[in-house]
Amino acid sequence: LEAELLSQNMHFSELSSGKTNQTELVALLITQGKDFVEGIENVYQKIKGSCSMLLLTEDGIIVARDKWGRTPIVIGKKEGAYAATSESSSLPNLGYEIERYVGPGEIIRLRADGMEQMRAPQEGMQVCSFLWVYYGFPVSCYEGKNVEEVRFLSGFKMGQKDESEVDCVCGIPDSGVGMALGYAEGKGVPYHRAIAKYTPTWPRSFTPANQEMRSLVAKMKLIPNRAMLQGKRLLFCDDSIVRGTQLRDNVKILYDYGAKEV
């Protein structure tokens, strides 16, 4: 796309980490349309993958969700104002209520006094399932489904069906905790916090480019509690299956710290 735009005498003025700024590239694709709708549709056609966007204009905010609906956008409303965000968890403390979820490929213009649909949503959706399982903040809702509720109910059903004999259930923080709490209730066993997360300075363990750094992050940010592990038959709920980095290392650490069964 960069080469294509340069061949059309387009000009890039911004760099991000030594590479063409992706926001500027998308902006140039939008300018190729006769209006915002045609320009955004051009983005939908040219970008391989997902691209949802918010455009701040003189006449309000234009909200556009990617054509497959993989990444969410929710519109909030309060008296005299509208807001758009990818995470509904950002709305309550600002006084907004969820008004609606933007559909796949849908384009909406927001003004303080109302909203205008500029492009209707298309049929079919390929929403990212990781939103509920891994990425999502517990109080966020996507497509009307609350993140923590989905995790809790998944664990609850698993706890009802699982026949493993365990002394307690634990969750790998953060997003494994909701499922572990549900499992504990469904199984009728106590929930123990046998492993804690130290979050400052450490990113998600699957994002670094090399395996050495991924392993270091996975090791350093999760700290086991020997007192809660010693001699216990533990069931851990862990959502981190992107690369399996934490799963492999954590099981070994739990045994090293005295767990009887994991």
PLM segments and residue spans:
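Conserved short alpha-helical segments that host acidic/polar catalytic motifs at enzyme active sites
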Residues: L1-P104, R109-V166, I172
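Short, well-ordered alpha-helical packing segments
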Residues: E2-L6, A27, Y44, A184, ...
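Secondary-structure transition/capping motifs at alpha-helix termini
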Residues: F12, E163-D167, E185-H192, R226-Q230, ...
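Generic beta-strand/beta-sheet core signal
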Residues: L56, A64-R65, G76, T85, ...
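Flexible loop/turn segments at secondary-structure boundaries
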Residues: R70-T71, L91-N93, E116-Q117, G176-A180, ...
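Short, glycine/charge-rich flexible loops or terminal/linker lids adjacent to PRPP-binding catalytic cores
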Residues: G188-L234
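PRPP/pyrophosphate-binding module of the type I phosphoribosyltransferase fold
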Residues: L216-V262
